[in-house]
Structure formats: C-alpha cells, structure tokens
C-alpha cells in the first residue's frame, strides 16, 4: 500500500535553487521525498542525494545521465544516493557512496 496522507487539505510550495531546470523529470523523486519527510516529521540525511522520475502510479522511472549524476554527487560529498532501480545496471560501483535503487515511491519512503 502506498503512503497515504491527509495532505489534500494542505498547500505545498517548492523552492528550487537558481540554475536548476524545473522541467527536469529527475527532480520528481527528490521533491516527493522532501514532502513526505516534512509530513512525517523525519529528516532525510543531509548527505543523501535523491533523483528519479515519478509516474502517476508511483513507479520510479529511469532518468538520463544517471552515472554522471552519481559521479557529481560523490564530488559534492554525498554518501548515499537513492535512484531508480532500473538505473542500477548502468552504475559503476563506488566505495565512496552507497547506491540504493528503488522501483516505486513506496520503496523510497521506507528508507526514511
């Protein structure tokens, strides 16, 4: 069962840092996780990076340039990366960052 909340009566405002393309579908999962984190009052570790496109049924879809995104996360000092499970086959192992693949929003929510 997917995460269900009583957020329908709430407004959510998302502020995106300058220079980030808001049309980038890889932002979806990070935004969903930020909203769930706020609603559940549980912080996501500041050394965790999250990316992936989210479909209407809650599935987490692949995004382009997954390896480059992971490489950049390592350069920026992130220790954990949550990404689409289908991208795992194209990601090289790296001892500097833990890579966690998720196939749907429910799996991602269990991580916080």
Language model regions located:
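Peripheral, non-AAA+ core regions of ATP-driven protein-machinery
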Residues: 1-112
